[in-house]
Curated annotation (Swiss-Prot):
Modification comment: The N-glycosyl content is primarily Man(9)GlcNAc, with a small amount of Man(8)GlcNAc.
Positions of Ca(2+) binding: E120, Q123
Key word Metal-binding present: yes
Record protein name field: Non-structural glycoprotein 4
Record's subcellular location: Host rough endoplasmic reticulum membrane; Host membrane, Host caveola; Secreted
GO cellular component terms, semicolon-separated: extracellular region; host caveola; host cell rough endoplasmic reticulum membrane; membrane
Residue ranges crossing the lipid bilayer per the database entry: 29-51
């Protein structure tokens, strides 16, 4: 177990692996060899570094499950970034946080819609009352007999007060 955390041992294994790959593939025209070697080196280093890191994390922390989960997610996200992917793995806690945020936003929007609907209903009721007040009465219900020009039909004696209301009056003002 001590060899797993020994840096010299890890570096010697990486050097041995690189030397082995160089001897196997001695073709100078091999264009992808540096990329393959670097990927294998990164994978080996991650493998060798992750085990001691998790052991140290488990010893020092009380919440072992969350630490292991975080380490694994971080390792996979690093591998995805090395592979060129922009997506990331998210933990269940992050998904629950995002779901809570979405649900909270939906509740806020529903409350706003409810307020707007209530205001619209109040406005419709107000418009209905205004319309009821402005409705024009039908002609057959209005007594139009007093609206005709009665000056031609009645004489001075027939007027109620003895004067024709349509005649202009003389107005005198005191000076």
């Amino acid at each position: 177990m001590e060899k797993l955390t020994d840096l010299n041992y890890t570096l010697s294994v990486i050097t041995l692996m690189n030397d082995t790959l160089h001897t196997i593939m001695e073709d100078p025209g091999m264009a992808y060899f540096p990329y393959i070697a670097s990927v294998l080196t990164v994978l080996f280093t991650l493998h060798k570094a992750s085990i001691p890191t998790m052991k140290i994390a488990l010893r020092t922390s009380r919440c072992s499950y969350k630490v292991i989960k975080y380490c694994i997610v971080s390792i996979f996200n690093t591998l995805l970034k090395l592979a060129g992917y922009k997506e990331q793995i998210t933990t269940k806690d992050e998904i629950e946080k995002q779901m809570d945020r979405v649900v909270k936003e939906m509740r806020r929007q529903l409350e706003m819609i409810d307020k707007l609907t209530t205001r619209e209903i109040e406005q419709v009721e107000l418009l209905k009352r205004i319309h009821d007040m402005l409705i024009i009465k039908p002609v057959d219900k209005i007594d139009m007999s007093q609206e005709f020009n009665q000056r031609q039909f009645k004489t001075l004696n027939e007027w109620a007060e003895g004067e024709n209301p349509y005649e202009p009056k003389e107005v005198t003002a005191s000076l």
